[in-house]
């Protein structure tokens, strides 16, 4: 091999050095890098799996949120409807009470008016009786007897009352 220009001991030493270097690189560099790449690949896969789980959880939470929101809306609408019904019932009840009070006040007012009317009529009867007596005395020129006088006055007043 000397003819080719290759030195055999140098070639063997280079082959041994290359194998030793390949072994050392494989042991200390290639395997740790490969292990690191596998670990990284595993972490990425786990992260993707976790991301998918989180995405599914978010979808469930979102669905739960929407369901609860719909339930809250239904409950709110129910509460509003019930409040409106109670308000209508209270309004009707208050109207009945107000009408009853108004009728009662009107009845009391009518009673008072009638009572005052009767008092005024009694007062007018007394005045009318004395005026009639006085007028009759002046016209007749004498006093009427008390018994006849009272009967005549009451008869006249009754006739006037029937005309009104």
UniProtKB/Swiss-Prot annotation:
Gene3D superfamilies: 6.10.250.1580. InterPro entries: ATP_synth_B-like_membr_sf (IPR028987), ATP_synth_b/b'su_bac/chlpt (IPR002146), ATP_synth_F0_bsu_bac (IPR005864), ATP_synthase_B_chain (IPR050059). Keywords: ATP synthesis, Cell membrane, CF(0), Hydrogen ion transport, Ion transport, Membrane, Transmembrane, Transmembrane helix, Transport. GO terms for cellular component: plasma membrane; proton-transporting ATP synthase complex. The chain crosses the membrane at residues 10-30. It is found in: Cell membrane. GO terms for molecular function: proton-transporting ATP synthase activity, rotational mechanism; proton-transporting ATPase activity, rotational mechanism. It is a single-pass membrane protein. F-type ATPases have 2 components, F(1) - the catalytic core - and F(0) - the membrane proton channel. F(1) has five subunits: alpha(3), beta(3), gamma(1), delta(1), epsilon(1). F(0) has three main subunits: a(1), b(2) and c(10-14). The alpha and beta chains form an alternating ring which encloses part of the gamma chain. F(1) is attached to F(0) by a central stalk formed by the gamma and epsilon chains, while a peripheral stalk is formed by the delta and b chains. Belongs to the ATPase B chain family. F(1)F(0) ATP synthase produces ATP from ADP in the presence of a proton or sodium gradient. F-type ATPases consist of two structural domains, F(1) containing the extramembraneous catalytic core and F(0) containing the membrane proton channel, linked together by a central stalk and a peripheral stalk. During catalysis, ATP synthesis in the catalytic domain of F(1) is coupled via a rotary mechanism of the central stalk subunits to proton translocation. Component of the F(0) channel, it forms part of the peripheral stalk, linking F(1) to F(0). This is ATP synthase subunit b. It comes from Herpetosiphon aurantiacus (strain ATCC 23779 / DSM 785 / 114-95). The gene is atpF.
